[in-house]
């Protein structure tokens, strides 16, 4: 029997745009769970599912769906921009994103992406 854990998880706390931010990434067999919070809670839970497009199978389109929280257009755009690279680098696996952040600016998004990259489990 192997000693490799069934669930792999990494976390990092860093100040992003002046706000203490916690990021936790957990790899399951079919999904990657990414939690990004500046409030100490999960906030909005968004599912990002890759779906193949006939023209380019190597870069599937990510379909977003809010599972919990406010379903606003900005959260779909923010979620795709924040974790699309996670799905691609993980072999087009689905991503569950739990996000509760104050700053949804492009600068904040780029900084959050780098913290997520540090927590790579895929």
Curated annotation (Swiss-Prot):
GO terms for molecular function: molecular adaptor activity; protein-containing complex binding. GO terms for biological process: chaperone-mediated protein complex assembly; proteasome assembly. GO terms for cellular component: cytosol; protein-containing complex. The keyword Nucleotide-binding does not apply. Pfam families: PAC3. The modification N-acetylmethionine is found at residue 1. Keywords: Acetylation, Chaperone. Homodimer. Interacts with PSMG4. Interacts directly with alpha and beta subunits of the 20S proteasome but dissociates before the formation of half-proteasomes, probably upon recruitment of POMP. Chaperone protein which promotes assembly of the 20S proteasome. May cooperate with PSMG1-PSMG2 heterodimers to orchestrate the correct assembly of proteasomes. Belongs to the PSMG3 family. This is Proteasome assembly chaperone 3. The lineage of its organism: Eukaryota, Metazoa, Chordata, Craniata, Vertebrata.
